[in-house]
Amino acid sequence: PFPLPKEERAGLLMHPAWLIAWSGNFDNDPIRRGKWILEHLLAGTVPDIPITVDAVVPEDPHKTLRERLEPTEAKACWQCHQKMTPRGLPSENFDDFGRFRKREVLGENLSIFSDRHRDAKSVPVVTAGAILNSGDPTLDGEVMDAFELVHKLAGSTRVRQSFVRHAFRYWLGRNETFDDSPTLMAADRAYTENGGSMKALIAS
């Protein structure tokens, strides 16, 4: 267990359980974190990785994870990665165990016992990211850290409607159809009018 000061957390996207679930085995994974935000909060999709593409992030003990992700900015890759990676990078303030950090350790895999890499070389974490091509022009733009990302998402109508849609799919065990539009609209209205009440959403 480790402390969770309020000034270091805000919402689901900064909860250790979510951060761990969308990390790799040995490192953070901004791509997977950003893909989750795209699909679950912004109602977006990306195609499957082409079978001809080597999708492994290169290992280099002298580079940060952000630097090792630079190959995904190539034109052929960026058309999809722009929807994911910039949204996941703000969570670099947290390691793959969900712990808050200000520096990234280089040259070795992080240990759950932080004192084991106390003397290892480290660099300040860069948390800048962006929301690009979200489908909501009021949402698109640069974000400086996970807090700004979370607050922008929390105020988005698109995110709210996507949340309601995913709740519908979860509770009914199927995707929505065109005939479900009145139900979804009623659910969104009930959720909004009752201050984001899950009880009201379920009852609707």
Task: Label each region the model flagged.
Residues 1-158, 164-171, 180-199, 203-204:
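Active-site substrate-binding loop specific to GH73 endo-beta-N-acetylglucosaminidase modules
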